[in-house]
Amino acid sequence: MSVRIEHDTFGEIEVPADKYWGAQTERSKRNFPVGKERMPIEVVYGFAQLKRAAAIANFDLGKLSEAKKDAIVYACDQILSGELDEHFPLVVWQTGSGTQSNMNVNEVVSYVANMYLKDHQSDESIHPNDDVNKSQSSNDTFPTAMHVALYQEVETKLEPALKLLRNTLKEKEDKFDSIIKIGRTHLQDATPIKLGQEISGWRYMLDRCETMLSESKKHILNLAIGGTAVGTGINAHPEFGDKVAHYISENTGYPFVSSENKFHALTAHDEVVQLHGTLKALAGDLMKIANDVRWLASGPRAGLAEISIPENEPGSSIMPGKVNPTQCEMLTMVAVQVMGNDTVVGFASSQGNFELNVYKPVIMHNTLQSIYLLADGMETFNNNCAVGIEPIEENIDNYLNQSLMLVTALNPHIGYEKAAQIAKKAHKEGLTLKESAIQTGYVTEEQFEAWIKPEDMVDPH
């Protein structure tokens, strides 16, 4: 393997000649061969947005030449294009401030920027610390890149997937509004409900999650940049943080602002905890929806079988013809993983000691994973399951007509105790509810027909 020699304050080190990173990235790569979880490329893109904005801000403030500013902006745009992904090899499991990933970006930006300057016959050169990292610290850059990445992924991936599934459920809600079925509480028969009403509960869960997500993501717009090492802003111009936030907003289209308290921004990540709490709530709702769907689709002959779902693949390696609710199982596993991630994010966020929380990479990794799992899970569940949900009306009608809980409609006419006697007699003697009611003498056939109307029970008002 062809190598080149790079150096840092620890001395010289060999780096692969075809890679753009420098000495500190190479040391991290060698010192932390831990796990397979690479630092998410979206964090790198968040850094690139930050370094780009910082270069422009430093130029505005007279701290960087125009040539250097242009070179750094060019390098950052190259990173944002996705052309340089291979040059960011570091794993999540590194220093808790994310210093090595910050330096990985600084070194790659410096390398590409220097090529740009050389191509433009400039005598200037870019240093990863003195120029790319000017007015910054890893302590304020990593949380800034984290917030930029999280906000963008919520906007571009999670929210569209949530809307997609929500809209499908709304279509099913409207389509099945005339189908009356038996409701169930405590896994036992209850009073009737429309299939559309049942699905409306699922849909409204997603409506509420969309609202909560919209609220919680607003806090992610606060950026730590400008706090530098401990929140005081040492080595940065007083206007630097605001300017960087402005330029990040200008390039992304999102209204980022510089946090009003940088001490908080470096040592606390409660804003991410709140965001992930919303992800956990969404996971809980998706767990409920997926479980309801697979229970209602259970069978085909010895289950509830009130709805059918698409048959996507063989379900068993031993039982011929078996088809399983695999999309529901996928979504419930996604939900469980997100709930586990929430524990990690909450605990890691509580570990800020004095002026810095040093669990930033694991907070970032778990939150991004939750966003991707939920987004992919909802889209896949929608396309391969939800769109194909159809009622099995014969079974729905049979369960409705056999249910003893229709007796509830007699309560206002004969009282709770007599109605209970009718239900118990029917269950014990294997009678229909109508037969039992007439045999007790509490109601006539005409009264039963007038009072027991499922269509009235689903819309009593």
From Swiss-Prot:
GO terms for molecular function: fumarate hydratase activity. GO terms for cellular component: cytoplasm. The active site is at H186, S316. Substrate binds at residues 97-99, 127-130, 137-139, 185, 317, 322-324. Pathway: Carbohydrate metabolism; tricarboxylic acid cycle; (S)-malate from fumarate: step 1/1. Homotetramer. This is Fumarate hydratase class II. It comes from Staphylococcus aureus (strain COL).
